[in-house]
Design a protein with these regions (language model features):
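Short, flexible, glycine/charge-rich loop motifs used to bind or transfer phosphoryl groups or to couple energy/partner
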Residues: 66-68, 102, 197-199
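Conserved short-loop catalytic and cofactor-binding motifs
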Residues: 65, 117, 130, 151, ...
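C-terminal region of N-terminal signal peptides and the immediate post-cleavage residues
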Residues: 43-61
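C-terminal cap of thioredoxin/glutaredoxin-like
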Residues: 1-48, 93-96, 165-235
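Structural alpha/beta surface segment adjacent to cysteine/selenocysteine redox centers
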Residues: 73, 78-168, 173, 234-235
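A short beta-strand-turn-helix
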Residues: 58-75
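Short clusters of hydrophobic/aromatic residues that line enzyme substrate/ligand-binding pockets
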Residues: 67-68, 158, 215
C-alpha cells in the first residue's frame, strides 16, 4: 500500500460529524509496518473522545501533554499534527492565531497537542525536540518555530543539528536540550500518540476534534468558529 498524496478527500465521516470539503489540502497516510511497530511500543491507547494530560511510557521520560490555554477553559480542541505536514503548517501560521486571539486568549478554549508523526524520521525527531523544548517551558514557541521553518520533507530541514539550533535561538539550555534530542527522550510518547491516532482511524493531517465534531485539514477560521460556538452552547 502506498501513501495517497492527493489534496482533497471525499471519505465519509466517522465517530461524529466530520468536516473536510473537497478541494481542501489534507495530507493522508497509509498503514504500513510502521503502525505495527508503533502499537508495540505504545501504552495507554485511548478510545475516541478520551483524553490525557500526560504520557508516561514505561522505561521512558515522562512527557507532559502540551496544552495551550487556561485549564478551566470550557471547550477543548484536540489537534493531531505532524511538523512536516504542509497543511498543518498552513493552519499553524494562518488559522491558529485567529483561534488563539478569539478563544484561547479569552479563556474559552484550550488547545491540546497530539503528535501524528507519520511523514518520516524528521517528523518524529521534530516531535521529540518540541517535547524537549516543553521540558524547559517552551513547547509552543518551538512548535511555532518548526512550522515557520518548514522546507520540504525528510530533506534535512529538521535534522538533529537544525533542531538543536532552533532551541539555541529560543534560549534553551544547550546541553540539556541537545542531550534530550540525541537521546530521543520523548520518542516513546510520540509513538504512543501515533498508536492512539491509528486506533481512532484518523488518516489525514491535521485532524481536530472539537466536542463531537471532527475537522480535517486547514479549514477556514469560520469552520472552527462554528464548531467552537456549538461546543460552547452545550456548556
Amino acid at each position: 500500500m502506498t501513501k495517497r498524496r492527493g489534496n482533497s478527500t471525499d471519505r465519509p465521516p466517522r465517530a461524529g460529524s466530520s468536516v473536510a470539503p473537497a478541494g481542501q489540502r489534507v495530507r493522508r497516510w497509509a498503514i504500513p509496518g510502521l503502525l505495527a511497530a508503533a502499537v508495540l511500543v505504545a501504552i495507554g491507547v485511548l478510545a475516541f473522545g478520551g483524553g490525557t494530560t500526560a504520557s508516561d511510557p514505561a522505561g521512558g521520560t515522562a512527557s507532559v501533554r502540551p496544552v495551550l490555554g487556561k485549564a478551566e477553559a470550557p471547550v477543548l480542541i484536540r489537534e493531531y499534527g505532524d511538523f512536516q505536514c504542509p497543511s498543518c503548517g498552513a493552519f499553524a501560521r494562518l488559522i491558529e492565531p485567529q483561534i488563539r486571539a478569539a478563544y484561547i486568549d479569552t479563556g474559552k478554549v484550550r488547545l491540546e497537542w497530539h503528535d501524528f508523526a507519520w511523514i518520516g524520521a524528521e517528523s518524529r525527531d521534530a516531535a521529540n525536540a518540541a517535547r524537549c523544548a516543553g521540558d524547559q517551558g517552551k513547547f509552543w514557541e518551538y512548535h511555532d518555530l518548526l512550522y515557520q521553518s518548514q522546507s520540504g520533507e525528510n530533506q534535512g530541514a529538521f535534522s538533529k543539528d537544525r533542531l538543536k539550533s532552533f532551541g539555541a535561538g529560543l534560549g534553551l539550555g544547550t546541553a540539556t536540550f541537545g542531550a534530550c534530542i540525541d537521546g530521543g527522550n520523548h520518542l516513546a510518547a510520540v509513538q504512543a500518540d501515533f498508536a492512539d491516532v491509528s486506533s481512532k482511524g484518523f488518516n489525514g493531517t491535521p485532524t481536530f476534534v472539537i466536542g463531537t465534531q471532527r475537522i480535517v485539514g486547514a479549514q477556514p477560521f469560520e469552520v472552527f468558529q462554528a464548531a467552537i460556538e456549538a461546543a460552547l452552547a452545550t456548556k
